[in-house]
Amino acid sequence: MPDKLRRDPKVLELVREFAEAEKLVAAICHGGWIAISAGVYRGVRVTGSLGIKDDLVNAGAIWEDAPVVVDRHFVSSRKPADLPDFCRGILSAMAGVRE
């Protein structure tokens, strides 16, 4: 699914608009591909599926191997097994995200 979404210009524009407005942008597993294609991860601390680690690094992201990484309004997680941490990270980020 992320592979299809990352090719949709409307999806990419939405992600860019959220990132620029400092609204929550969250991705788990291969979902980081969408943010990569939107060009919003440069200089952002992230995690994701080990299979996209090189893609994240090549896009300018700062890779961390952790269940969840929260960097301002960006939340990322590695895999479905990390879902509890991912949900806590989203709640944490939402507490600090401007409307």
Which residues are covered by each model-predicted region?
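Active-site-adjacent pocket-lining segments in enzyme domains
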Residues: M1-E99
